[in-house]
Regions:
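A conserved active-site cap/scaffold subdomain adjacent to cofactor or substrate pockets
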Residues: 198, 210-257
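Conserved nucleotide-binding/hydrolysis modules and their immediate coupling elements
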Residues: 1-78
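Active/ligand-binding-proximal structured segments within catalytic/core domains
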Residues: 35-51, 75-126, 372
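Divalent metal-coordination and catalytic microenvironments
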Residues: 42, 100-102, 126, 195, ...
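Glycine-rich, acidic loop segments that terminate in or are immediately followed by a histidine
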Residues: 193-204, 301-400
C-alpha cells in the first residue's frame, strides 16, 4: 500500500479503494490501497476524519499495513471519498516540529540533549538533560522563533542502510531491521523520526514556552506551538485586558499595580492579624474573669457561633499555655459543631481525649487527641450546650 502522508503531508483528501475488511468487536477495520491517514508514531497522534462519510475512529499500523477503524462498513469498495480532520493533523505536525526545533536549539546553543518528550492534546513537553535556568531557556526560545522566520527547509526521507551509515544524527539511531526515517531541519537538526512534519519552519508560525520544572536529572519544558501558541496569546491578551479593567490601569502599568495591590493586601492582613490578636486577648480576659476556679485550676467553657475554628483553637492553646487552665470550647457553624478541649500540661489528673470521647457522642460526632488536647466535630449542634455542661461536670467530679 502507498503511504501518501509521507509523499505529501499537506494532502487533506484523496480517493481510496478497499483491499481488505476485518470486523472486530463490531467495528470495521479497513485497509486501503493508498492512504493519507497517518497512523501515529514518533510520539505524534494519529489522524481521524471521514471515509465515504463514515467517521474514522482510529488509525493504526500492523505489519506495515495501515488500518482505518470505522463505525460501519462502507457500501462501496472503490472511489471512496477520504477526508482528514485537517485541524487535528496540522496541529500534530506543528507540535512535533516544535519539539524538534526546541531540541535542536538547546543542543546547538548549549550542547544539551533531549532525553524525552510528550505531545499532548493541549500542551506538549520536552525534557532537556540538566537543570536549566530561565536565561538559558528564554535564549533557546528566542532562537527557535528566529529560525521560524528564517523559513528553514524541513526534509523527511528514508535512507538505505548503506546511506544511513553516513548520516550523523543528534541522537543515536535505533537498532532495528525496519525502515528508519530521518527528519532534518536543514542547518540545525538531524534526527530519526517516523512522524509527519511541515515542509518548513515558517509553517510553525510561533513557539511559546509556558513553564518548566526539574524532572529527575533533566528540565521538563512545557510549550505550545503554531495555532496553539496563537490561541494561547489571544487568551492571555483577553485575561490581561480584564485585569487592566479591574485594576484601572494600562497594560504597561499592570505589574506595578499588582505589586501595589499585593503590598496593600499584606498590610491589611498584618493589621487584621494584630486586631484579631487584640480582640482575642480581650476575649481571653473576659472569659477568665467569669470562669470557675477549682483550686488553682481555671475551668473555661464557652460556646461560639459562626467563628473560625482555627482561630478559636489558637485561643484555647494560648489560655492553656499562659495559665493553669482547662478549656472546653464549642464552635457552631451551620448545622455542625466542633469541640475543642485543651488543658495545661501540668494538669495530670484529667485526660482530654477521654473527656472528648465521652462527650462527642452527644453531638453525633467523632474525634480524638491526646491527654492535653482533643478535638472533634458532629452534626447535632442542638445538643451543644448539653455537651459542654456534661464535659464540665465530668471535670468537676475529677478535680474536686
Amino acid at each position: 500500500m502507498t503511504k501518501l502522508y509521507y509523499e505529501d503531508q499537506y494532502m487533506k483528501e484523496f480517493k481510496g479503494e478497499i483491499i481488505e475488511v476485518k470486523e472486530l468487536d463490531g467495528k470495521f477495520h479497513i485497509l486501503l490501497e493508498q492512504t493519507a491517514f497517518f497512523p501515529g508514531g514518533g510520539g505524534q497522534m494519529g489522524d481521524l476524519g471521514l471515509i465515504d462519510g463514515i467517521k474514522v475512529l482510529d488509525v493504526y499500523e500492523e505489519e506495515g499495513k495501515v488500518y482505518h477503524v470505522l463505525e460501519k462498513e462502507p457500501k462501496k469498495l472503490k472511489n471512496l471519498q477520504c477526508e482528514l480532520d485537517w485541524e487535528r493533523r496540522f496541529d500534530g505536525m506543528q507540535q512535533h516540529l516544535g519539539q524538534h526545533l526546541l531540541s535542536g536549539c538547546f543542543y546547538d546553543l548549549f550542547g544539551a540533549n533531549t532525553c524525552g518528550f510528550h505531545l499532548g492534546k493541549e500542551i506538549s513537553t520536552v525534557d532537556i538533560v540538566g537543570f536549566l535556568d530561565e536565561k538559558t531557556i528564554r535564549e533557546a526560545e528566542k532562537e527557535a522563533n528566529r529560525l521560524i522566520f528564517e523559513n528553514l527547509e524541513v526534509k523527511s526521507y528514508a535512507p538505505s542502510k548503506k546511506e544511513l551509515k553516513k548520516v550523523k544524527t543528534r541522537r543515536a539511531l535505533p537498532k532495528t531491521e525496519e525502515e528508519i526515517r530521518i527528519v532534518e531541519i536543514v542547518g540545525l537538526d538531524l534526527n530519526a523520526c517516523c512522524g509527519v512534519h511541515p515542509r518548513n519552519t515558517r509553517d510553525l508560525q510561533v513557539i511559546k514556552i509556558r513553564r518548566w520544572e526539574k524532572h529527575k536529572n533533566a528540565t521538563r519544558i512545557e510549550y505550545v506551538a503554531g495555532n496553539r501558541a496563537v490561541g494561547d496569546f489571544f487568551t492571555k491578551d483577553e485575561i490581561l485586558g480584564e485585569i487592566c479593567k479591574l485594576l484601572k490601569s494600562g497594560e504597561g502599568d499592570t505589574l506595578n499595580a499588582v505589586k501595589n495591590l499585593l503590598e496593600n493586601n499584606k498590610n491589611l492582613v498584618d493589621e487584621n492579624r494584630k486586631v484579631k490578636a487584640e480582640i482575642g486577648n480581650y476575649k481571653i480576659k473576659e472569659m477568665l474573669n467569669k470562669s470557675e476556679r477549682i483550686g488553682s485550676i481555671t475551668l473555661v467553657n464557652e460556646v461560639f457561633d459562626g467563628e473560625d475554628t482555627k482561630h478559636i483553637g489558637k485561643l484555647a492553646n494560648k489560655i492553656t499555655e499562659e495559665y493553669e487552665a482547662i478549656v472546653l470550647f464549642a464552635v457552631k457553624n451551620g448545622d455542625r459543631v466542633n469541640l475543642i478541649f485543651n488543658s495545661s500540661k501540668d494538669i495530670k489528673k484529667v485526660n482530654m481525649s477521654d473527656i472528648l470521647k465521652d462527650t462527642i457522642t452527644l453531638i453525633d460526632g467523632r474525634g480524638g487527641g491526646n491527654q492535653f488536647a482533643a478535638q472533634g466535630g458532629g452534626k447535632n449542634n442542638g445538643n451543644t450546650e448539653v455537651a459542654i455542661d456534661y464535659a464540665t461536670n465530668k471535670i468537676r467530679n475529677i478535680l474536686i
